[in-house]
């Protein structure tokens, strides 16, 4: 891609997201969504392969449909309230349609169908943007309207997303699809607590983005896209391979790693609100995600696939890539659980 075009596309993506996050007028929010969607399409298609074009087309159709539903809800609310203000939603039907539109943009169940397919058809760098940065704009709008959204609808969507995120990843060998289903499950956890403590959703989002970014950087360092190529990374860089598996267990929420912290705090918050059945179901379904991460760890570390490279490290296998940010990121996002008391005072 032309460097100048790449800079312009990146700035447009950032600007579109910033417009959505800082606007209080629905028309500006819609414009920000459209800017972001149109700018991300070339990023998804930068490989110029049929699979990438297919993924970009699926992404475009889904996001365009969600934007149409969002404008339908906004106009419906305008007819009843006469206002374009984001936080002023008076009509229950408009609130429900608006929530479903944002759920579709986030890729939550039952509108999760596009996330694994799009993530699988694009390169790792584009997948990183899709599963992290692209969550900011819809979730910020959902955060602003959380006071007028039906808690029952949010909890139903969150439980379905956690279940789909766990079940969907069980039979996968493609790392991008595994991370896509993990994203669906994590978004389910965020929406579950949104009606009770929206600020806790921001903590979960921050930790999710940082852990997912670290995981993608490790995969890009190893050039790993499947469990087979991930198992071969032991011969090239054993420490990086070990770190990759540790951060993936953290994504699964295994204590005492960092990924356990947001789940712990969300279950605690739901219990405070006299909701016992919901956190119990969420904790049980979270075991599905943890299971496929532990199975992945076992298959890539304790067993080795048949390969000509299962020998001692050779000079031609030495990895010359240097990523200075990886060591502190790996350390922080696997061993940050002792920060829980400090974070609990903030959230």
Curated annotation (Swiss-Prot):
It is found in: Mitochondrion inner membrane. The chain crosses the membrane at residues 13-33, 59-79, 96-116, 122-142, 149-169, 178-198, 201-221, 247-267, 274-294, 323-343. InterPro entries: Complex_I_Subunit_2, NADH_DH_su2_C, NADH_UbQ_OxRdtase_chain2, ND/Mrp_TM. It is a multi-pass membrane protein. GO terms for molecular function: NADH dehydrogenase (ubiquinone) activity. Its EC number is 7.1.1.2. It comes from the Eukaryota. It catalyses: a ubiquinone + NADH + 5 H(+)(in) = a ubiquinol + NAD(+) + 4 H(+)(out). GO terms for cellular component: mitochondrial inner membrane. Coiled coil: none annotated. Keywords: Electron transport, Membrane, Mitochondrion, Mitochondrion inner membrane, NAD, Respiratory chain, Translocase, Transmembrane, Transmembrane helix, Transport, Ubiquinone. Its main location: mitochondrion. GO terms for biological process: mitochondrial electron transport, NADH to ubiquinone; mitochondrial respiratory chain complex I assembly. Core subunit of the mitochondrial membrane respiratory chain NADH dehydrogenase (Complex I) which catalyzes electron transfer from NADH through the respiratory chain, using ubiquinone as an electron acceptor. Essential for the catalytic activity and assembly of complex I. PANTHER family: NADH-UBIQUINONE OXIDOREDUCTASE CHAIN 2. Belongs to the complex I subunit 2 family. Core subunit of respiratory chain NADH dehydrogenase (Complex I) which is composed of 45 different subunits. Interacts with TMEM242. This is NADH-ubiquinone oxidoreductase chain 2. It comes from Megaderma spasma (Lesser false vampire bat).
